[in-house]
Amino acid sequence: NITFDTGSSAIQGGFTSVLDSVVMVAKEFDKTLMQINGYTDSTGSFQTNQSLSEQRAGSVARYFMNQGIPASRIRSTGYGPRDPIADNSTASGRSQNRRVEIEMLPMQQ
C-alpha cells in the first residue's frame, strides 16, 4: 500500500522506489491491467473523501503513465472511506487507511 498525508493526494518521496518496482513488473508482464484503488480515512465529509480518494488513485495512475505504462492498461477508482484496513478512531489507524492499493490483473482478451 502507498499511504498519504492527511488531505493530500501527493505521492510521498519515500514511495517512489516502491512504485518504480511496480513499473518494472508491469513492463515485464505487459499483458496485465493495473487496477489502482484509492481510499481515505473517515475524517471529513463523504463527498470530500470520495473526491480525495479519486485524486490519490489518479496521482498513482499518472505516475505510472509518466513511467511509460500505457493508459489503456490502467484503471483507477476511488472508494473514499469505505473498506478501512485499520481503526479510524486512532491516528495510526487513520494513517493506514489513507492509502492506494495496486492490483495487477490479467487483461481480458
Segments (PLM) and residue ranges:
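Periplasmic OmpA-like peptidoglycan-binding domain that tethers envelope proteins to the cell wall
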Residues: 9-16, 27-29, 37-109
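Acidic/histidine-rich, surface-exposed loop or edge segments in extracytoplasmic proteins
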Residues: 1-3
